[in-house]
């Protein structure tokens, strides 16, 4: 299609002619005899665009023409209408040629094969039609539907006369239906279009002329609204906005057809009405004025409203989040606090601010009406539904103030129980007439405060002090629960420093048993106990004032045990009666012994076991030993190498019997205080050939007076005497017991101390 400009206004939009092919008929439109094959366009300066339009098949075109051939109107009326509209088209038809897209840059060789259509302004301006292919296809389908409807409606009319269907789609301005006989004043239209340009309104209207042999003047008026235009109007209101004079021209028996596209595309309403036979004597009406659009709110007005809204909102006592929640309950649209904040800061888009402004105005008026007659603290107003005042209840509660007398009562309850149960908290709250949640929070905070004041430490002192026993040649006082320092001998202070784990074993500590005078030989005291005290005071192992102490410090993860080593120069040489302590394998041997002792019946006693072993039952009264007690020893030699077969059995009774029968465990007497005495009988070389182990789990039987093993019976003996004192009431393992081995010459004045490890 070759386009010529017959005016000084530049062409910017091109719309191809939908060609309806009929192989049997080829003719020209009567309106094309004036030789003007150009297109007259009057409009604004818009960007030139090519519009792709999908093609229709030949079968569809023939079916459409078949219906159009049945429509006939008066030729003179159509000619008068065509001349009044200044629509001049020239149509050259070629059979089987599909609809094509025409661009201004086409070569002249294509001009003969392209239908020529004259486009002109109809109440508006021809501008660039920016349609997607889907929208263009829909537009063609709608045009075909209107042609078919017009053909069916005029099937009873005269044939060989073409009918026109006026299709008007407007989403920007309510356009008035224009009768075909009304001329259009282009100059006045241009003036209106200039006004519209100042308002930034892109009004696009097109007149599509599809002349065929039998359809001499089929005219289509199409108005398309650009996407993104603010002033969109509802499509269903289009027909109601048509003037009465245009409605009078419609056939009473032929309803309009309204087709609305999907929401994804711009709204279009197409009303198909047949063109009436216009009498030639009809007078030319006046120019139709295009109604002006409502101007959207400008930026200054929005800025002023946002500022006013923020001030009034703060004055009413609402937060931005309260406004969003209230609007969601009132109008069904939930708005976040960020949205309200951006509106007040003018950070939203112009479109969104225009949408949000009326909602905020309505909410502000409702909020002011509610608070005008009542205060914000009126609960009836706060709880009334539908007023959007629920946001006030979301405010942070004030800090709870607790009176002094209640605080004192809570402190007293905290000292009694730092972590009460839910029932106890409820009881306290009822007594103090306070809320349960307040009491619960107070206890939580008080416990945290206690942790800050008295932080728990791994090296802290235990609640139970060391219970050391001091024995002397005088009658033994065994019930002293604290450190005994009443000995006239020189005291020795040893710091607990060496950590021991449960798997650690003390290496061999030997007291050489060689004869002869030697000052290098020392008596060794080995003790393992939990760090229940930082300083342990124990009596000296001899009367010598020159006592020395060797201590070392080390620390492990969270737990510290104690190893005490006291060395005292010996005043005389060691005899064969002295004790050699070999502690290698002490943990394994103790565990084996305890395993056998744990399987004893609960009603067993040391008296019964001693009687069964052949010992004199008169030495041990049953009342002095609790049920389940166990007493056993080891054979001479290293603890881990020369164990007796009887010890390996599960019967402690057999162990005691074997030890007693072999003479390695002589029990000589039992003093009046309940102390079991092991002493040297005559010149026996070895009194106790190995360390004596008392089961720590069962030594709790000595609750009143812990057992003290001393050699008081041989106070006047001439030979060397060795005493063994091993008492403990540990509850965990033999490693936490205190083993003391001592040796001296002369009178039996050697004393030892033991600890009670909790």
From Swiss-Prot:
TM region(s), chain numbering: none
Xref: InterPro entries: HD, Homeobox_CS, Homeodomain-like_sf, Lambda_DNA-bd_dom_sf, POU, POU2F1_C, POU_dom, POU_domain_TF
Gene Ontology cellular component list: cytoplasm; nucleus; transcription regulator complex
Record's note on what induces expression: Up-regulated by notch1.
Region span, Disordered: 1-43, 271-296, 377-398, 450-472, 534-573
Keyword field: Activator, Cytoplasm, Developmental protein, DNA-binding, Homeobox, Nucleus, Transcription, Transcription regulation
Tissue: Expressed in oocytes (at protein level). Expressed in the tadpole brain (at protein level).
GO BP annotations, alphabetical order: Notch signaling pathway; positive regulation of DNA-templated transcription; positive regulation of transcription by RNA polymerase II; radial glial cell differentiation; regulation of apoptotic process; regulation of transcription by RNA polymerase II
PROSITE patterns in the cross-refs: HOMEOBOX_1, HOMEOBOX_2, POU_1, POU_2, POU_3
Positions with biased composition (Polar residues): 1-10, 19-30, 275-285
UniProt-annotated location(s): Cytoplasm; Nucleus
GO MF terms, alphabetically ordered: DNA-binding transcription factor activity, RNA polymerase II-specific; RNA polymerase II cis-regulatory region sequence-specific DNA binding; sequence-specific DNA binding
Pfam families per the UniProt record, alphabetical: Homeodomain (PF00046), Pou (PF00157), POU2F1_C (PF19536)
Positions of the DNA-binding region: 395-454
Function: Transcription factor that binds to the octamer motif (5'-ATTTGCAT-3') and activates the promoters of the genes of some small nuclear RNAs (snRNA) and histone H2B. In vitro does not bind to variant octamer sequences, such as the H2B octamer 5'-GTTTGCAT-3', although binding has been observed in vivo during early embryogenesis, suggesting that interactions between pou2f1 and other factors might be required for octamer-dependent H2B transcription. Acts downstream of Notch signaling during radial glia formation.
Family: Belongs to the POU transcription factor family. Class-2 subfamily.
Family annotation (PANTHER family): POU DOMAIN, POU DOMAIN, CLASS 2, TRANSCRIPTION FACTOR 1
Notes on the domains: The POU domain controls nuclear translocation.
Record protein name field: POU domain, class 2, transcription factor 1
Native source species: Xenopus laevis (African clawed frog)
């Amino acid at each position: 299609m070759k386009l010529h400009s017959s005016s000084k206004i530049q062409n910017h939009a091109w719309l191809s002619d939908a060609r309806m092919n009929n192989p049997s008929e080829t003719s020209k439109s009567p309106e094309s005899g004036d030789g003007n094959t150009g297109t007259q366009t009057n409009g604004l300066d818009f960007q030139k665009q090519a519009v792709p339009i999908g093609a229709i098949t030949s079968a569809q075109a023939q079916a459409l023409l078949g219906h159009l051939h049945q429509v006939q109107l008066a030729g003179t009326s159509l000619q008068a209408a065509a001349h009044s509209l200044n629509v001049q088209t020239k149509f050259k038809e070629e059979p089987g040629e599909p609809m094509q897209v025409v661009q201004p840059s086409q070569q002249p060789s294509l001009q003969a094969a392209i239908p020529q259509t004259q486009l002109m302004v109809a109440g508006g301006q021809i501008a660039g039609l920016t349609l997607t292919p889907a929208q263009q296809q829909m537009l063609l389908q709608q045009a075909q539907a209107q042609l078919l409807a017009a053909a069916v409606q005029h099937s009873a009319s005269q044939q060989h006369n073409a009918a026109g269907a006026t299709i008007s789609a407007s989403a920007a301005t309510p356009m008035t239906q224009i009768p075909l006989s009304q001329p259009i004043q282009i100059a006045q239209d241009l003036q209106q279009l200039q006004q519209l340009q100042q308002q930034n309104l892109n009004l696009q209207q097109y007149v599509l002329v599809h002349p065929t042999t039998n359809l001499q003047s089929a005219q289509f008026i199409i108005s398309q609204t650009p996407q993104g235009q603010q002033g969109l109007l509802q499509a269903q209101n289009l027909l109601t906005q048509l003037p009465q004079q245009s409605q009078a021209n419609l056939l009473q028996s032929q309803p309009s057809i309204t087709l609305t596209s999907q929401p994804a595309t711009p709204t279009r309403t197409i009303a198909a009405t047949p063109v009436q036979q216009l009498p030639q004597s009809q007078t030319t009406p006046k120019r139709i004025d295009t109604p002006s659009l409502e101007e959207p709110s400008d930026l200054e007005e929005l800025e002023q409203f946002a500022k006013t809204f923020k001030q009034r909102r703060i004055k009413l006592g609402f937060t931005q989040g309260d406004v969003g929640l209230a609007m969601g309950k009132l109008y069904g649209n939930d708005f976040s606090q960020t949205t309200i904040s951006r509106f007040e800061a003018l950070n939203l888009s112009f479109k969104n601010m225009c949408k949000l402004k009326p909602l905020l105005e309505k909410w502000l008026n409702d909020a002011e009406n509610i608070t005008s007659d009542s205060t914000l603290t009126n609960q009836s107003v706060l709880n009334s539904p539908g007023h959007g005042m629920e946001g006030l209840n979301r405010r942070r509660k004030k800090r709870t103030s607790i009176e002094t007398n209640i605080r004192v009562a809570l402190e007293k309850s905290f000292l009694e129980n730092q972590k009460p149960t839910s029932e106890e908290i409820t009881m306290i709250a009822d007594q103090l007439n306070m809320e349960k949640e307040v009491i619960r929070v107070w206890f939580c905070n008080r416990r945290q405060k206690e942790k800050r004041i008295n932080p728990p430490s791994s090296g802290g002192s235990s609640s139970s002090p060391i219970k050391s026993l001091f024995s002397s040649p005088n009658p033994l006082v065994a019930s002293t629960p604290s450190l005994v320092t009443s000995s006239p001998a020189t005291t020795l202070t040893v710091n607990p420093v060496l950590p021991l784990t449960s798997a650690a074993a003390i290496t061999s500590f030997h007291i050489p048993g060689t004869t002869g005078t030697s000052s290098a030989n020392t008596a060794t005291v080995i003790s393992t106990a939990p760090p229940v005290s930082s300083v342990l005071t124990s009596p000296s192992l001899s009367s010598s004032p020159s006592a020395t102490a060797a201590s070392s410090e080390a620390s492990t993860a969270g737990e510290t045990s104690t190893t005490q080593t006291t060395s005292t120069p010996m005043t005389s040489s060691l005899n064969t009666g002295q004790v050699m302590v070999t502690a290698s394998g002490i943990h394994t041997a103790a565990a084996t012994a305890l395993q056998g002792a744990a399987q004893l019946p609960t009603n067993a006693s040391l008296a019964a076991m001693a009687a069964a072993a052949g010992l004199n039952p008169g030495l041990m009264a049953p009342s002095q030993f609790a049920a389940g007690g166990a007493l056993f020893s080891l054979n001479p030699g290293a603890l881990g190498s020369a164990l007796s077969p009887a010890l390996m059995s599960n019967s402690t009774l057999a162990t005691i019997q074997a030890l007693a029968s072999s003479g390695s465990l002589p029990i000589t007497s039992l003093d009046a205080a309940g102390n079991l005495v092991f002493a040297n009988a005559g010149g026996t070389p070895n009194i106790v050939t190995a360390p004596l182990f008392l089961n720590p789990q069962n030594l709790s039987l000595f609750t009143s007076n812990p057992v003290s093993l001393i050699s008081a019976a041989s106070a006047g003996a001439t030979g060397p005497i060795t005493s063994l004192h091993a008492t403990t009431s540990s509850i965990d393992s033999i490693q936490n017991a205190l083993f003391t081995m001592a040796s001296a010459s002369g009178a039996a004045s050697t004393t030892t101390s033991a600890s009670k490890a909790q």
